[in-house]
Design a protein with these regions (language model features):
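Bacterial N-terminal signal peptides that target proteins for export
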Residues: 1-10
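C-terminal/domain-edge helix-coil "capping" segments
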Residues: 25-38, 122-173
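Surface-exposed short loop/turn segments
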Residues: 82, 86-147
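Amphipathic alpha-helical segments
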Residues: 63-80
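A structural "domain/chain start" motif
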Residues: 21-66, 166-173
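Short glycine-rich, low-complexity/disordered patches
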Residues: 31, 77-89, 170-173
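Generic secondary-structure microfeatures
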Residues: 41, 47-51, 71, 79, ...
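Bacterial N-terminal signal peptides
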Residues: 10-21
């Protein structure tokens, strides 16, 4: 392929990446990570919107409380108890939802959503050492019109929670 054709293909791929409504990447939802969901009865939900995106998300009505409420409802529908604690203890697994984004020119918004289950784990090489570690995760990176980013992002979080619930049910039923 000539240099000019290669450059054109590269530009088209680059532009299609940024024009697409959303591009999805699964980070860690497989049979190995699903086994870590077996026997899970309760979770604490922690939502974190990174700065400076927090202000942009607030402008469109997407707050940590709104996300936490939506995630908690999905968990309760799956018969997983949600524990509300200010500072979650290591004994309670944490479903961590992280949201980051960037408003470009007021027209397009790029975002990253990650949902990860953190649980107490014991190091095999030293069973006296207990740590919180991620055992299951999923994530989405994408972009879309800034005017509808709140609803679109919440819809994607709901889809990701459906994936978590499906993984949980596969491991437990």
């Amino acid at each position: 392929m000539s240099g000019k054709k290669y450059l054109i293909v590269l530009i088209v791929l680059f532009l299609s990446f940024f024009i697409a409504t959303s591009v999805i990447f699964a980070i860690g939802d497989d049979k190995n990570s699903r086994s870590s969901l077996r026997g899970l009865k309760k979770l604490s939900v922690v939502v974190q919107i990174e700065k400076p995106a927090i202000d942009d998300f607030k402008k469109v009505g997407l707050t940590e409380d709104r996300i936490r409420t939506g995630v908690a409802l999905k968990l309760q529908e799956a018969k997983i108890d949600v524990v509300y604690v200010e500072d979650p203890a290591m004994e309670i697994p944490i479903l961590h939802v992280e949201l980051n984004g960037s408003n470009r020119n007021g027209k397009t918004f790029s975002f990253l959503i990650e949902i990860e289950l953190w649980q107490k784990s014991i190091l095999k090489r030293d069973p006296k050492v207990e740590v919180m570690t991620g055992t299951w995760s999923t994530g989405i990176f994408g972009s879309g019109p800034a005017s509808n980013i709140g609803n679109e992002t919440m819809g994607l979080i709901n889809d990701m929670m459906d994936s978590f619930v499906k993984a949980y049910q596969t491991a437990n039923f």
